[in-house]
Amino acid sequence: MIAVLFNMVPLFAEEYEISTANTTLLLETSIGRRVNFVYYGPRPATPDEIYSTGSDIRWNAYPCFGTNCTCEHALAVTHANGDVSLELATQDVKQYTDPDGGRVWEFLMKDKVFPFYVKQFYKAYDECDIIKTWTEMWHTEKKTITLDKFASAYIPVKSGDLYLSYLAGGWGAEAQLFEERITRGRKTIGNHDGARTSFNGNPSFMVSLDGPAQENSGNVLGGTLAYTGNYDLSFVKNGNANHLEITAGINAELSQYKLDPKVTFTTPEFIFTYSTEGKGGISRNLHRWGRNYQIIGGTDSREILLNSWEGVYFKVNQEGMNAMMRDFAAIGGELFVMDDGWFGDKYPRDNETTSLGDWVVSTKKLPEGINALIDEAERNGIKFGIWIEPEMTNTKSELYEKHPDWVLRQPDREPFKGRGDTQLMLDLCNPEVQDHVFGVVDNLMQAHPRIYYMKWDANMSMNNASSLYLPKDRQSHLYIEYHRGLMNVCKRIREKYPDLIIQLCASGGGRLNYGFFPYFNECWSSDNTDAIQRLYIQCGMSHFYPANIMASHVSASPNHQTKRVVPLKFRFDVAMTGRLGMEMKPSDLTEKEMEFAKNAIGTYKSIRPVIQQGDLYRLISPYEEKPYVSLMYCTPEKDRAVYFLFRRSYLRDTWEDARKLAGLDPDRNYMIREINAADPQKKVYLDGKVVSGRFLMENGFRLNLGQDMSSIVLELIAQ
């Protein structure tokens, strides 16, 4: 009997080494046994080094509730007969290479009693030091079962002096960085909004393994969940296990999923990485992966655009748009985007209370139509874009009058209304609504095929959590099926219009998430365009997302949100750290300011490849609350770099520290040039100097900015 058992279950598990250029994830399993998570961290010379140093964990790689699992679990189900137990055992392991070059491992597991199956995937991207994981699950039980929890990933981390870095915030204050020590208990980063899932938090984190996180040194684990809906990241540390347990996945609260036989449920992808170069190393890994593998058009150059919103708000008219385009083209602009206020026939869009859903041009506002605007744009040598909010409607609209059953609402309650006390969300669980939302883009493109860019907005939370389309016993599917419907629409759009540039917007940066970026080229970072505030917002974003998705616009002074007066140079220099744009009427600038703006736009064009495709080094964070903020970008080849220094406030008794750089080649010399100078005839003393990369990184230079909201930009060119 014992001999037969040994033949069925091997005595020793087989190791599966999932390695990238600098990291290794080590798993072990054998047929009939569970998959164990053994190690994740710096790549060893051999796996023996992991064991000989006590670095192995050997913990269940995907713990299931119900059988000897009192720790955090990744999966919990209720079977058709009411049983809540699971015990997964490996049936098969496969390895192959995807068309994009990523290497994939599949672990097929089955419950030891019930015909319930889980396939766990790991995909490695060598040059980015990125691994992503997700699961598929299905069953062949006779009746429907319930998925009570269904995480994408479970990662155990050896206990130590652990610190958590994450983003949180709200409208006008997105992506604020928070850092705290991980103590015993549970820390959760989650979202229940349903639509705008990045205001309260962001499904991304870093864990420093050896004390407070440092920018360019130290061991750090980072991760992000690529999911557009409600999510949950949990960090659990207790006395029963000598490690931190991290789970990431769909927020299962109010989303229990009834899974029918032979139907496959797929969890979102969780992307994780490890670096011995601190938080900066995590950021650079994610940026590189995002640009090359996740963001549509991620390696393409992004145009410098003017958005009409803060210039005219709802006061859109033919001559006003033409004038803005002419003025912007005159200073070197490349793309004009007409924001809210252009549509509505029966109900012209004069304010926020009407017209959403009626995506036809308002002949009252634009009697010559959109094609005439595109003609004017092309006469001035620029491209044309337009704003839409296709997931929404107003109660005062032709769409709502025709299809009141298309909105999310409880059948026996008055719906809660959003913006303007008239806005409602459409029910994207409904295939007819999906066709309508696809048609918003398709009809515009069919009528105006020269539209180059669309800004896709979403200005309401999912406040009415009920679908008139879903069956009564599947209402808990709402949060999941809505986003499945949205992704279905996005896929259809991309299949038909692969080259259309689409900006992701949700009352600002409310949808900052890698789950959207296979379909959206960039993100509107925040409705708050104040340059000082943007230093914080864009620094937070940069921890996980690259500069080329970060729409950063120069707006009026005083700023419309904060009323702060900020010099034009400072506003441009801050905006240049992302994808440069403008959010104002150029005609409001003086002649001297117009000349500066023209030169600044020309300067950005010359450094655009470095900013949008370079490696980021955060040198002085705004969250350090020092007078200065500093960052720089270097090309991967280290032949060009751009350095930014901002002075927020002047403190007379503050000594000037040496400005040490990062990311340069220590064995090359660099010519330093001041660019975007306020006065080209009065450049900084460093202009024209040649200094070695080693000296610039180890010693740095002294540079004093003598007043509030002053800034300087330096370009470094390898000799």
What is each residue range found by the language model?
Residues G297-G439, H448, Y453:
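Aromatic-lined carbohydrate-binding/catalytic grooves of carbohydrate-active enzymes
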Residues F65-L88, S217-Y231, Y274-I295, G333-D340, ...:
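Glycine-rich, aromatic-flanked loop segments that form ligand/cofactor-binding clefts
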Residues P203-V207, E215, P622-P666:
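Carbohydrate-binding surface patches
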Residues P367-G369, E401-H403, V407-K569, R579, ...:
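Active-site neighborhood of glycoside hydrolase catalytic domains
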Residues E14-L27, I31-N238, E253, N669-Y685:
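Polysaccharide-binding surfaces and accessory modules of carbohydrate-active proteins
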Residues N22, T135, K262, A377, ...:
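Conserved, mostly hydrophobic/aromatic
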Residues S85-L88, Y257-T276, M709-I717:
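Short Pro-Gly-centered flexible turn/kink motifs
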Residues S649-Q719:
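C-terminal beta-sandwich/jelly-roll accessory domains of carbohydrate-active enzymes
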